[in-house]
Amino acid sequence: MASKKMTKSYFDVLGICCTSEVPLIENILNSMDGVKEFSVIVPSRTVIVVHDTLILSQFQIVKALNQAQLEANVRVTGETNFKNKWPSPFAVVSGILLLLSFFKYLYSPFRWLAVAAVVAGIYPILAKAVASLARFRIDINILVVVTVGATIGMQDYTEAAVVVFLFTIAEWLQSRASYKASAVMQSLMSLAPQKAVIAETGEEVEVDELKTNTVIAVKAGETIPIDGVVVDGNCEVDEKTLTGEAFPVPKLKDSTVWAGTINLNGYITVNTTALAEDCVVAKMAKLVEEAQNSKTETQRFIDKCSKYYTPAIILISICFVAIPFALKVHNLKHWVHLALVVLVSACPCGLILSTPVATFCALTKAATSGLLIKGADYLETLAKIKIVAFDKTGTITRGEFIVMDFQSLSEDISLQSLLYWVSSTESKSSHPMAAAVVDYARSVSVEPKPEAVEDYQNFPGEGIYGKIDGKEVYIGNKRIASRAGCLSVPDIDVDTKGGKTIGYVYVGETLAGVFNLSDACRSGVAQAMKELKSLGIKIAMLTGDNHAAAMHAQEQLGNAMDIVRAELLPEDKSEIIKQLKREEGPTAMVGDGLNDAPALATADIGISMGVSGSALATETGNIILMSNDIRRIPQAIKLAKRAKRKVVENVVISITMKGAILALAFAGHPLIWAAVLADVGTCLLVILNSMLLLSDKHKTGNKCYRESSSSSVLIAEKLEGDAAGDMEAGLLPKISDKHCKPGCCGTKTQEKAMKPAKASSDHSHSGCCETKQKDNVTVVKKSCCAEPVDLGHGHDSGCCGDKSQQPHQHEVQVQQSCHNKPSGLDSGCCGGKSQQPHQHELQQSCHDKPSGLDIGTGPKHEGSSTLVNLEGDAKEELKVLVNGFCSSPADLAITSLKVKSDSHCKSNCSSRERCHHGSNCCRSYAKESCSHDHHHTRAHGVGTLKEIVIE
């Protein structure tokens, strides 16, 4: 069997005006050997061909397309190289000659320059007309040639020249507009670079040649070429182009990175987990291509009508000449002019483009916002949605469970043994609850052994089963009891407050254990619900969790749900979706897991959580949410409604323009040049109107990135987001404050970190362990105040709300030392020695009372961050950069952090500042009333951090 080498090639085909050229391209490509499949995307004037390069080259395809005068050229590596930046020489020369012909009023021989203008500009139109006739097709080029010929025959040379010039220049403008409309999508499809660097050798290779489990290197500023897992190093990654995430995402060892995202800082090595063609960005591009090539119901209707429109108009125009000629009317020239106006109006390009261009722009906007809509029909249906149903776990809630309590109910089974059986069985499940149980087991020194589990089974909506050490173990909700052979679940005193999820463990037919898990709602969910309500859309929650957990989520969201159904099996969800479709109308279902797949498939629109969701959910969903921010859902519905309005506007523009020209002609003013201008001008207006979908209706501030520093810097940053303080969605609240600087207070601009204070002169060990020297470290507190105020010693200032006293930046020093015998710590600080910083004190001036901050325990890698919980609602993120501390920065561990305060606080916090920083803004900043070192603190008002002592 002959070998094959299949390649996907992209071609820019500027000769595509509307869908009427698609059959021509199909006939050309179908007649060529080596073509496996192809698609034609009319709005972007793109042809995508999968072909065998051993049989058919790209240049052979270009040659075949250009024989039909389609102006095709190869697009290199999926990028758009627009070649018509300027009008063609034919149009330029024709325009100059036409302009000179108007001097005929001064010197009559100049009128012949109009004929020269026709000759100069007609060639490309004539060539396309001949190519169309050769294939027995009637298009706008043939109609224009006939019109120009008839006009010259009537000695209207100037009008003929105007027709030729307007047609050529308008086509150029249309191609420019089409390029602008498709440029965003082309950049999306060419996100991933074509080359990668092998970490071990430094060799640069083609991405297509990379195999899985190859370790590659990615430097700061480079685009990650392929999906993988970080092996070494850490960095921040800009995932905006892929997920719509507004802020950089920190990546540490074992973090997943995606092709097409940008490494903003740091050096990482990545172990590849997919081939180039199987990367998320490649699948994303394929889905977008398929969606662009699909048609809405409206578009199919218009295309069907256009098949009859052109022949009917041509027949009418012939009648306008034939009937007056047969009747020998005295003003035959008027009727010929009228017939030519009608003839030029026979091309319905503007009407045909009205739907696909608007759809194309909407799909492009969605894709660049982290929403993949798999087809044009789904976009049209999305605009009609009346009710949205949500799964709870992993969709409304984070799906990041924590085991709060685990009990053994059998005297014959120890807690250690039960936890071993449960965690070993759960380690074979992909459910987020399973991961929480496994983590809990390891935290109490129980190591699961999944290889010891036999006959593992999953029961969707109920639980799992596995056989281990001869024991049959069932784990799940109440329904799992029937699988274990029990008819009912005994009443057990289990804490279900706070919406905890209860899990039951059966060993054989005996209820051997019970555990509860806690989960929390995602940030932004309440906002998403509010926006859906404002659109007149009802909301339902369908969950397999217990009623208590479901109602707790309902309470957290302010009773936003119109319908709440709990303890549902997958088939129950599907039946409820059918019921909602009958009673409410078009229904959307949002889910992320295996249990949601039937409901996603049943709904009119299935929306799956893409990158985080299961593979099956992603395949089942009609729309893929690339991030976990469900605020994208109301955005998608708004976009679909805007696209629907644009389609209506485009149709109205097309019909109105044609109707106006015909009405003018029948009123006694048959202007042929106006008819041509209306035809090509309508196409241009339709494209420009549709491009408004690509613009952001609500402008946001510029995104800014934290500057990395080679020195040891600790950044304490205020998190302003949802009430939960969650930065996961990457979107800050839109707060308008006249005292705020541009980009602050809810926008995305951050201030630059200050330079570190002068460090110790001895850097042999950076002040760590063996020498016990101290390093100076700068802490920068970011704020949203209008202007820095440098006050002298002993001066007090108010919060940000004060007119003249605004916190700006905070500089403190961190002292680090190592103890020879740290209490309760196993790992050393540097070089593996048993010297570990184990306690930190934060002295914060101007607090009435000490505020406890819990930042968790465990190693803090360079570049890692942790959430600091203040008293009340406020939260802060502590960013750790420890380049200068240890040769092995991963050994630096933070075990506790205490806040000290003095009694100088004169609370003067304004309500606006409390809005920014929680229930008490003095927890974020303190009043300045303390002495300084050689440099003043340029951050006054609410809370100057004074000293962090690492002992």
From Swiss-Prot:
Enzyme nomenclature, EC number: 7.2.2.12, 7.2.2.21
Main location: membrane
GO molecular function term, any single one: ATP binding
Entry keyword Zinc-finger: no
Basic and acidic residues bias locations: 841-851
Broad EC category: translocase
Topological domain ranges for the Cytoplasmic compartment: 1-83, 129-135, 179-304, 354-647, 692-951
Pfam families recorded: E1-E2_ATPase (PF00122), Hydrolase (PF00702)
GO cellular component: plasma membrane
Compartments, as annotated in UniProt: Cell membrane
Keyword line: ATP-binding, Cadmium, Cell membrane, Magnesium, Membrane, Metal-binding, Nucleotide-binding, Translocase, Transmembrane, Transmembrane helix, Zinc
Renumbered residue ranges of the record's region Disordered: 841-866
Stated role: Plays an important role in zinc transport and homeostasis. Could also be involved in cadmium detoxification.
Similarity comment text for this entry: Belongs to the cation transport ATPase (P-type) (TC 3.A.3) family. Type IB subfamily.
Name of this chain's protein: Cadmium/zinc-transporting ATPase HMA2
Gene that encodes it: HMA2
